[in-house]
């Protein structure tokens, strides 16, 4: 078959540009744009073979990469796709903690804001109970400090507790010292509230990006066993297209990285991991992409969601059309989409899905003088 990947790239970029332009128009045209973009992605998947970037050979001069499997390849191949257990994660924060909201609401104003986090979290927990599923819940330290009983309830209902920072500040905008203090504070508050040890971390807005690799060393120093802050797609806030798609030990550390789910077509990683992508794009596109990863690549996926994403009655505090779209659109249908996903796929916490990798002996860390930045490991 001729190599049409170059043409595919042009078409995808053009479609994405059209989608963004239409988003500035009306709800009807933006819906049309989303459907068109999703249909294009689905059609392209029929023509381009999936490639696993993580299995390719590294460039000359780079150390070999270390992919971490949740099971041996032979065991995975013997597991029917319908039996693969995926990781469901929740970033537990309130509607005024988001990056979009931070432009309108300062940290000093948080205590004065009407909170909706308890009701939204309870709805998510009930939804998970309905489908006999459990999740990893990455808790914002500020929320744990204000609502410790809520965090203890989450843990008592069988969910894994992780750390989502204290003040929801992007890591790439912090110094190493500030990041360490923020994370240390959050970890202690969350552990005290939940009554359990916290070994998993997720950065706000997936903000551990090229140039902030020092954050991995700090996380390891603070006692974390894994991180789930890498989303290997292009985004204005986190351009991580060169990062691995499947779990890795971060170079030079014993820290396991659990990336967010992506669907690979040609040389492109398409976002299918939840959040705004699940809210704004058609369900069929997300569901098909997840099925491709499970059935063709024999890999579990990691999804994420925020409690405020199922709360369409949250206050509208955002100025500007784009901000309103990012925070509010799709909140009326998000719960129904989650219900469909939980009905069709199996989910568990990260610590359960990747228990084999987390319990296995980690590789010998690379000497500091020989380290190559984590994000440079994938060509």
What is the predicted role of each segment?
Residues 54-71:
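Cytosolic juxtamembrane segments of membrane proteins
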Residues 27-34:
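Short, aromatic-rich membrane-interface segments at the entry and exit
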Residues 270-280:
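Surface-exposed cleft-lining segments at the edges of enzyme active sites
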Residues 40-58:
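Membrane-helix interfacial anchor on the cytosolic side
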Residues 73, 77-200, 205-266, 285-379:
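Catalytic alpha-helical scaffold of carbohydrate-active enzymes acting on polysaccharides/glycoconjugates
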Residues 1-3, 78:
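N-terminal hydrophobic targeting signals that begin at the initiator methionine
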